[in-house]
Amino acid sequence: MAHIEKQAGELQEKLIAVNRVSKTVKGGRIFSFTALTVVGDGNGRVGFGYGKAREVPAAIQKAMEKARRAMINVALNSGTLQHPVKGAHTGSRVFMQPASEGTGIIAGGAMRAVLEVAGVHNVLAKAYGSTNPINVVRATIAALEDMKSPEMVAAKRGKSVEEILGK
């Protein structure tokens, strides 16, 4: 698993995985490379991309472009999550919960990279089932998309934020 971090303007880019894959044809095998990347602004915007090409740099470039085009907004609460969230994709399941200041990002592998570029600073996270990086990233993004701020919930229900929080 390789990690490369670059600053493109204000976006943080992380390379999560590069994999060699092959296509078997009559004359033998044709090798190509896949790359999984995440891109974020460190302030609640994050996206991931998966690129494939005959050469590693081209695969990484394609993945970065796809990640930039597929960014989502995440409602963060002062560097942590709004509430505990679960996400799943195929055989991967993830659970993330907010943590107090100073905890750091307690998460493994692909999930850590997504949370870092999204701007989450304190979180407790666990991946269950398959730990395939692509599926873990998709499950993490799905969980972050499902997270709603109290303001969003209040607006949907037509109530005040105080009523939602029970204050």
Curated annotation (Swiss-Prot):
Domain of life of the organism encoding this protein: Bacteria
Ribosomal protein is among the record's keywords: yes
Keywords: Ribonucleoprotein, Ribosomal protein, RNA-binding, rRNA-binding
GO cellular component: small ribosomal subunit
Gene3D superfamilies: 3.30.160.20, 3.30.230.10
UniProt cross-references to SUPFAM superfamilies, sorted A to Z: dsRNA-binding domain-like (SSF54768), Ribosomal protein S5 domain 2-like (SSF54211)
GO BP annotations listed: translation
A Pfam family assignment: Ribosomal_S5_C
InterPro entries hit by this protein: Ribosomal_Su5_D2-typ_SF, Ribosomal_uS5, Ribosomal_uS5_bac-type, Ribosomal_uS5_C, Ribosomal_uS5_N, Ribosomal_uS5_N_CS, Ribsml_uS5_D2-typ_fold_subgr
GO molecular function: rRNA binding; structural constituent of ribosome
Domain S5 DRBM: 11-74
Keyword Repeat part of the UniProt annotation: no
Record family assignment: Belongs to the universal ribosomal protein uS5 family.
HAMAP family to which the protein is assigned, alphabetical: Ribosomal_uS5_B
Function: With S4 and S12 plays an important role in translational accuracy.
Quaternary structure and partners: Part of the 30S ribosomal subunit. Contacts proteins S4 and S8.
Notes on the domains: The N-terminal domain interacts with the head of the 30S subunit; the C-terminal domain interacts with the body and contacts protein S4. The interaction surface between S4 and S5 is involved in control of translational fidelity.
Protein's recorded name: Small ribosomal subunit protein uS5
Gene from which this protein is expressed: rpsE
